[in-house]
């Protein structure tokens, strides 16, 4: 009981913006035409325990969603698509749109450091259990070379029946992990503002998935509010 005497509990909520992307933009992606974040929200409860010399521990449980929509121009981009019931694999040149959406439970374990009575730094690992996942899109306004750069040429148009669609949702991981870095600023006795960056250190796809050749990492920033319950 004495160990919990000086511990605090916070209710937290936030809004996240970011995306799922490779660390380096590959040469096969020539241009990002558009990017639209989804309504990415985070809710949860945080447990904070101070220790000695300004150090402490923060953990908790959060439910959150992360998603985005992008459209890019690509050249010789490896794809596996479906059109008219036929599955086609090869190198695509044209436009690709992508929709990503995930719901998850997240457990962080963060070291904290106090800078005065109001400002707190936080950093450490997190793990997320994915409860809902979606990675879908279409290839359009271009052509696909079957198998290799000199393979048969398949034209893909703009209209729905002329596009090639893909759905890699089942190839996504059920568990993700990474690093969080953030800070809290407590501007009243009970209320505080929060900001953090979460960087997935493992890609969102399973290890045996190779259709997208680059490793895709979830990278998001979150701003929000915290309310001190105890």
Stretch-by-stretch model annotation:
Residues 54-57, 118-121, 189-195:
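Repeated loop/turn-to-beta-strand initiation elements of outer-membrane beta-barrel proteins
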